[in-house]
Regions:
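N-terminal export signals
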Residues: 7-28
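C-terminal segment of N-terminal export signals and the immediately downstream linker at the start
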Residues: 23-43
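Signal peptide-proximal N-terminal region
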Residues: 56-78, 200-205
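Extracellular/periplasmic periplasmic-binding protein-like sensory domains
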Residues: 251-324, 336-341, 383, 394-423
């Protein structure tokens, strides 16, 4: 099985729900002992670069927090495991909880993996704070009221924002629309959201082509030829893995982008690989919850970006923010619960304290809703190649809150998108 960020593979394996009795983390822990936090993230494969970016960020965050007293006076000790397929990742999650005795587990990028891991976390009464994983099957929330599981913003936020910015920046400038999107639920739902938003704003456009390459396809010439033959004047693509730079490079060589507007709502995952030499100007370019070059960046973001670029010689993307946000909200929850109870809190007490606590993350302020789904700040805008880097930045920055881009608790996504008050 190939790992994808938004795969929604249904997991019915025998290992998904163990027969072991639920366990409680004992609160009577030596207060000077290190606080062990498990990290599960991909380190290879199609999502490997994303996982590495998140791991680097959480290591930076832990070091910074430890210099300031750690979490409630305890130094943070990270225990890192790799996210791969659902079965193996669930086994590693159990090892972190049962053998390593971590106090919480953070990470997970693939929704296919997180759908399998989340029920295990509930069973084990173990805190799980996801970076980019959800418990959505397509657009349907499968775990509306978890006790211990905290999820990322909804899968579709970046597509909703990119679609709205296509309306804002390109309305009246295109008539023929094509899409090339990954062939699984994330790509198909993003494409449908784009179509519905155009319809809602009364934009009359002909949809002239749809291409559905499998994730990881590195020869996209046939897809590019089909797109070019359709003669679109706007192309929408929610590609975000290593195939996106390949598509842009091969499309440029074929002359696909000449006179064509583009919407790439998740492009920043591949930021460092999207070189100016094959990237046209003016793309609606999605940075999700962290734009590394923001002109009004916080002191926290500036410090992180400087350290990151000095050490790794590349720019960080939104997975860094997701990793920092997870640790920051966990820290806030532990300290709030300890203050309220007067002793080291149980995972249940931390889970009860975390929703609603606003923290400063790398990309701005964020919080978890009562249903334990994140609300953060999203950044996109038209791209420019007029900068000091070898990849595009944003000519102007559009900023939306997640509350403007994702359905409220209990809502149906497709009904919400028809009636919600939109920020454009």
């Amino acid at each position: 099985m190939k790992l994808t960020r938004r795969d929604f593979t249904k997991l019915a394996g025998a290992g998904m729900l163990a027969a072991a009795a639920p366990r409680l983390f004992g609160p009577a822990i030596a207060q000077n002992a290190p606080l062990k936090v498990g990290i599960i993230a991909p380190r290879s494969g199609v999502a490997g670069t994303a996982g590495e970016c998140g791991i680097r960020a959480v290591q930076w965050a832990a070091e910074r927090m430890n210099k300031d007293g750690g979490i409630a006076g305890r130094k943070i000790e990270l225990v890192v495991e790799e996210e791969t397929n659902p079965k193996d990742t669930i086994e590693r999650f159990r090892r972190l909880v049962l053998q390593e005795k971590v106090q919480s587990v953070h990470g997970l990028i693939s929704t296919g993996v997180s759908l399998g891991t989340a029920p295990v976390a509930e069973e084990e009464q173990a805190l799980l704070v996801m970076w980019d994983g959800t418990t959505q099957d397509g657009v349907k929330e499968m775990m509306p009221n978890p006790k211990y599981v905290f999820r990322s913003t909804d899968n579709e936020c970046e597509a909703v924002m990119g679609s709205l910015l296509a309306v804002k920046h390109f309305k009246g400038k295109f008539k023929r629309v094509a899409g090339i999107n990954p062939d699984y639920s994330y790509g198909r739902n993003n494409w449908e959201a784009f179509r519905q938003i155009l319809a809602r704003y009364g934009i009359e456009a002909e949809f002239v082509a749809e291409q559905w390459p499998k994730v990881g396809t590195m020869d996209l010439t046939s897809h590019i030829a089909a797109l070019k033959a359709a003669k679109p004047d706007l192309i929408f693509s929610s590609m975000l893995f290593a195939d996106l730079p390949v598509f842009m490079k091969q499309g440029h060589a074929a002359g696909l982008f000449e006179g064509v507007k583009m919407v790439l709502p998740a492009a920043a995952w591949q930021l460092n690989q999207l070189k100016k030499e094959f990237m046209p100007e003016g793309i609606i370019f999605g940075h999700n919850t962290l734009y590394f070059d923001h002109p009004q960046a916080s002191a926290l973001q500036k410090a992180f970006v400087q350290d990151y670029m000095d050490q790794y010689k590349e720019a960080p993307h939104w997975e860094a923010d997701r990793a920092y946000f997870a640790l920051a909200t966990y820290k806030a929850g532990v300290e709030a619960a300890q203050k309220a109870g007067g002793k080291w809190p149980t995972p249940e007490q931390v889970a009860e304290a975390m929703p609603g606590l606003e923290v400063e993350s790398l990309g701005g302020k964020g919080r978890f809703r009562k249903d334990k789904i994140a609300e953060q700040v999203f950044y996109q805008g038209p791209s420019t190649n007029a900068n000091k880097y070898d990849f595009p930045t944003l000519a102007s920055v559009d900023t939306f809150q997640a509350s403007q881009l994702q359905k409220p608790p209990g809502a149906d996504f497709w009904e919400w998108i028809k009636t919600a008050k939109m920020p454009v």
